[in-house]
Structure formats: C-alpha cells, structure tokens
C-alpha cells in the first residue's frame, strides 16, 4: 500500500515499527533511543544483555535475547549493524518478507534529514570529540540531538533527542559507512592506519575515503580539520570546501596556547578567530584531549556559542564511558593501594596518548598497564608499534586477544607480542588467558602507589569495573 506522507509525524504513523538487529551496540542503541523518543515502536535483538539494552527496555523498547526469524514479523523496517552476518535469521526473514533493510549508518543519515548534521570522523578521538561538541552546543543553548559511540556520563546515555536544529553524531570510517552521511559540518580529528582489512590493506584507500567524506559536504558546508595531524593537514590543503582548522599549530584558525597539565585537567589559552581568546580549564587529561576540545570549540564558535560558554562546557564536562575513567583507589590483599583508570584505547596511537596523559598527571607513580589486544588483524598489522609503545611502561600484563569474531592469526597473539616486548629488554610482560584472570594475577605485579591502566576495546572494561567494586578477586570468588 502506498501511504501519503506530509511530515515527520506522518512517517511515524505510517511506518511505526522499527527492529534493530544487534541493538546492544553503541551506535545502534543510540539511534534506537532517538527513534523511541520520536515515537517509533522500537524492538531489537542481541546475543547479550548490557547497559544499553537495559536502558532501552526501561524506555519502552521490546528487547529479545538471541536472533530468530520471528523477531522481525510485523515490523516496517529492519536496521542492521555492520557486525551482523549475512546468514543471520532475522536478516534472511526480512529479505524474504521484503521488509526494508537499513544499515546503521543509513538510518543515521535518515535522522540527519530532519536536523542539520555535524559528523565527527577520524581514526581516534571521535567519541570524546562528539561528546564535547554536544556539551558545548548544549551550554550555548542550542539543545542538540546527539548520537555517540559511548556513554556521555552527564546524560547517562549515548543519545538524546534535542529540541534544536543540530544533530551531532560519530561518523564511522572503520567500514566506510561514514560515506552514507550528508552533514552540513564535518570534523576530522586524525587519519591513521586502522581497519585496513576493510580497505584491501591499502592505506591509500583510507585516505581516499576521508577525501570523499569531505566531498559529501554541500558547497556551503564546513570542514573542521585538525592540522596538527599530517594526513589531515594534507587533506585540508586540497579539499574544495570551506575549512576551519584547529590544533596547536600557529597556523590553526582555532588553537591552544600555554598548555599545561594539572593532574587530570588541562589548562590552556583558547585562541579563536578575530583575535578572541579565552582561558580554559578542560576536565580531561592529555594533549590529545586538548585537540578534541579545540574541535568542539571551533564548532561552537562557528555556531555563535560565546567563548565563556565554551569554557564552561569544557570545564564542566563529566567525561565519556571508558575514556580515561578514574575508577578510584583499590587495595590489594597485601595492602598495596593502587588507582585504577579504565580506557577504551586499543590502537598504538591511542595507547601512546593515554600513557602520556597518565605520566603528565601522575609523574611520581609507577605506570602499570593491563592490556587486552583487540582483533588479531590489528595485532598483526600494528605489531611492531604495539611492541614499541607497550615497552615504555613500568609493568605490563597482557590478556589474550579479544577476537571480535576473527579467527586466530599465527604470530599475532599476546604470547608473540610478549616475546617481542621482552626482546627489547625493558620489561618482562606477564600473559594471562581471559581478561577475567587479570583480577587474580594483577596483585602479584602491583606495588603501593601504582597507577593501573586497564585498556582495550573488548571485555576488559567489565573486569576493571568488577575490580573497582569488588576488589582483586578472581572470577567466581566470594
């Protein structure tokens, strides 16, 4: 049946039921929450229960554990994440019933039709930059909609339907899906070699994808680009769109000067166009987070947010889940008191930035790292860089690679990585199996006063939270 549509409410009434396959993912759950708030009847399936699925259920979504063809019956549209296999029973049933199927990024693009889109891309820093941008626009009274790949701690959610005209969202380059978006403003934080398996193991194709991403801006759109990153600077020089640059470079349109780290905060002078300046205290550690804040400040300034409002947003920022989260101090059975930091970093560049932030704020402490490598392909592709950066810490415990659906690759596991680190002669890494084993092994490595970084994109975050709440008890201990 062909239904006549006149406005957004007509769309909801005509096609009210939307089903998400893999609804527990960070990107999927955020879109689902926005659509719930818009008035859609949202259902979804996932193999595991998590914070996101529980939140969606509390908001009225119907959540199913596991995947079944019956889950999609009666729905008007099926949204799928890139992690869903082609033989998924729900996807196959949707095809057989000729139910429209939308990739996650395509549905995000549909939401952008009803707002003015700001897309945040880059190999590293997307989640924090998106969150900071949403915070700046909110402080400026613009009430944005946001869809973030992590939990914005102040909101207790990774998405919100705002009343304003702007939508701020992460643009995922990992599988090229960011090329489905048509924003009015695009941020690129940096361009690095990651997810090469989706680009034919050819970095030139990654570079070309980011160039095409900017080409999707309208002629009146704006590219907000970090020229401290050489790849982004090269792209800025040749992109045929309006550019606002940011960074610590003297040539940047929006820049930070007099940058000083004070524990878990950064203090700097924010230089804006037209000779405007503002003293800023950023409630996040590390020079990489200063760059993330500059991107948010650039967008805020462009949209008329006052400099003092930008500063208030940055100082009051409560953080994002698993991005240098200070979980507090825990005492081992032997009496050693250690501070635990939980972080999502899983690429050598991210590890290096987090290590620098930790040493900048706690230079007097021993830096102990528990790291769970993520994906065999990334471990293989970045093997030498991982070995180099992990060799720089005072003590290291590695859990086995979190496969994320990949099959093992010879020479790309944690034991091989430990051998490479050991050969450098600077540390003696300890290797465990599952991340859950870290709770019982770490006390033998830790000393009083240590700073413990627990890092990785797999399930190590749950282990960090368990230790912070329950102490250093092995899995299954009372």
UniProtKB/Swiss-Prot annotation:
EC category name: ligase
Recorded GO CC terms: cytoplasm
Pfam families the UniProt entry points to: Mur_ligase, Mur_ligase_C, Mur_ligase_M
GO molecular function: ATP binding; UDP-N-acetylmuramate-L-alanine ligase activity
Localization terms from the record: Cytoplasm
Binding positions for ATP per the UniProt entry: 122-128
GO biological process: cell division; cell wall organization; peptidoglycan biosynthetic process; regulation of cell shape
Record pathway: Cell wall biogenesis; peptidoglycan biosynthesis
Catalytic activity from the UniProt record: UDP-N-acetyl-alpha-D-muramate + L-alanine + ATP = UDP-N-acetyl-alpha-D-muramoyl-L-alanine + ADP + phosphate + H(+)
Gene3D superfamilies to which the protein is assigned, alphabetical: Mur ligase, C-terminal domain, Mur-like, catalytic domain, NAD(P)-binding Rossmann-like Domain
The entry's keywords: ATP-binding, Cell cycle, Cell division, Cell shape, Cell wall biogenesis/degradation, Cytoplasm, Ligase, Nucleotide-binding, Peptidoglycan synthesis
Claim: rRNA-binding is one of the keywords in the record: no
EC number from the UniProt entry: 6.3.2.8
PANTHER family the UniProt entry points to: UDP-N-ACETYLMURAMATE--L-ALANINE LIGASE, UDP-N-ACETYLMURAMATE--L-ALANINE LIGASE-RELATED
HAMAP family in alphabetical order: MurC (MF_00046)
Biological role: Cell wall formation.
Recorded family membership: Belongs to the MurCDEF family.
NCBIfam families: murC (TIGR01082)
Protein name: UDP-N-acetylmuramate--L-alanine ligase
Gene: murC
């Amino acid at each position: 049946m062909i239904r006549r549509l006149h406005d957004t409410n007509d769309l909801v009434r005509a096609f009210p039921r939307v089903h998400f396959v893999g609804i527990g993912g960070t990107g999927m759950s955020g879109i689902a929450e926005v659509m719930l708030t818009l008035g859609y009847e949202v259902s979804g399936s996932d193999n595991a229960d998590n914070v996101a699925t529980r939140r969606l259920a509390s908001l009225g979504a119907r959540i199913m554990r596991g995947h079944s063809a019956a889950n999609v019956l009666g729905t008007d549209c099926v949204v799928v994440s890139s992690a869903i296999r082609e033989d998924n029973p729900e996807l196959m049933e949707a095809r057989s019933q000729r139910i429209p199927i939308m990739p996650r990024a395509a549905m995000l693009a549909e939401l952008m039709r009803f707002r003015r889109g700001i897309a945040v891309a880059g190999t590293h820093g997307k989640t924090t930059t998106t969150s900071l941008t949403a915070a700046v626009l909110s402080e400026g009274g613009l009430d944005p909609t946001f869809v973030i790949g992590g939990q914005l701690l102040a909101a207790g959610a990774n998405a919100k339907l705002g009343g304003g005209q702007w939508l701020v969202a992460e643009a995922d380059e990992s599988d090229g899906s960011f090329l489905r978006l048509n924003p009015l403003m695009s941020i690129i934080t940096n361009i690095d070699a990651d997810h090469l398996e989706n680009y034919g193991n050819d970095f030139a194709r990654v570079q070309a994808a980011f160039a095409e991403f900017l080409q999707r801006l309208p002629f009146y759109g704006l590219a907000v680009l970090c020229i401290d990153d050489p790849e982004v600077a090269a792209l800025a020089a040749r992109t045929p769109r309006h550019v606002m640059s940011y960074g610590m470079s003297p040539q940047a349109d929006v820049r930070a000067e007099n940058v000083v780290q004070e524990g878990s905060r950064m203090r700097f002078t924010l230089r804006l166009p037209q000779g405007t300046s503002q003293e800023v205290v950023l409630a996040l550690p590390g020079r990489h987070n200063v760059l993330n804040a500059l991107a948010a400040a650039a967008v805020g300034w462009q949209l008329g947010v006052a400099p003092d409002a930008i500063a208030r947003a940055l100082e009051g920022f409560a953080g994002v889940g698993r991005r240098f989260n200070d979980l507090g101090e825990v005492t081992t059975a032997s009496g050693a008191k250690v501070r635990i930091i939980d972080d999502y970093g899983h690429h050598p560049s991210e590890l290096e930035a987090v290590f620098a932030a930790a040493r900048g704020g706690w230079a007097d402490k021993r830096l102990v790292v528990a790291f769970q490598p993520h994906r065999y392909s990334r471990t293989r592709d970045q093997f030498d860089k991982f070995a180099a950066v992990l060799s720089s810490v005072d003590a290291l415990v590695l859990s086995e690679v979190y496969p994320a659906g990949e099959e093992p690759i010879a020479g790309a596991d944690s034991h091989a990585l430990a051998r490479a680190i050991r050969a450098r002669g600077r540390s003696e890494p300890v290797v465990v199996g599952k991340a859950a084993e870290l709770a019982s092994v770490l006390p033998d490595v830790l000393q009083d006063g240590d700073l413990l970084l627990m890092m990785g994109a797999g399930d190590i975050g749950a282990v960090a939270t368990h230790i912070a709440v329950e102490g250093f008890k092995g899995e299954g201990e009372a």
